[in-house]
């Protein structure tokens, strides 16, 4: 489903002032309650919008996972500017995440799940890599018409996302972030 994939040529919008205002990284990752001992996976890490501040919040590794090598190269450049050495770069799709079972305490996945071809399979993969007691934070576009973002027919409504998570063995809490939403979820 390449028609849904983010175009790396538009990577500059991922670090824009508008995005910083709508999705302030520190406020958003605050929902993950990151501890310095947490190992984190940022799925669909892009150029590091969340991976970099998360790496600054933990003494352990942040696995920056992205299917697009160009995005990982940009992320590495951004992390090098911040002199971060605790980011591991993983080129992988999300229906078979190239991380070990039970390898992370937290998972961040921002504005990506609407792109995956099989949501249930991806949620199963996330469950596989999460340690017992770990949690995930999902950020997605609400299924409303907006000037930017993916087409309405690609978006997943917050209620549908919560139901899908519950069906896949997670407890889910929806947090409205107009025009986005967050879902904090833990494995049941």
Predicted features by range, described:
Residues 41, 47-96:
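Class I SAM-dependent methyltransferase SAM/SAH-binding core
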């Amino acid at each position: 489903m390449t028609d849904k994939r983010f175009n790396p040529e538009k990577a500059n919008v991922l670090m824009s002032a508008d995005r910083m205002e709508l999705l302030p990284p520190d406020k958003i990752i605050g929902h993950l309650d990151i501890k310095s001992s947490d190992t984190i996976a940022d799925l669909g890490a892009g150029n590091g919008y969340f991976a970099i501040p998360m790496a600054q919040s933990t003494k352990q590794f942040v696995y920056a996972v992205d299917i697009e090598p160009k995005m990982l190269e940009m992320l590495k450049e951004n992390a090098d500017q911040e002199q971060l050495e605790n980011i591991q770069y993983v080129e992988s799709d999300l229906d078979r995440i190239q991380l070990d079972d039970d390898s992370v305490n937290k998972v961040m996945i921002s504005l990506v799940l609407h792109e995956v071809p099989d949501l249930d399979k991806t949620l199963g993969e996330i469950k596989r890599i999460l340690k017992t007691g770990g949690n995930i934070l999902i950020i997605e576009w609400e299924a409303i018409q907006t000037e930017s973002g993916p087409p309405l027919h690609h978006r997943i409504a917050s209620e549908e996302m919560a139901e899908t998570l519950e069906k896949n063995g997670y407890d889910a809490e929806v947090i409205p972030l107009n025009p986005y939403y967050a879902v904090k979820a833990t494995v049941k």
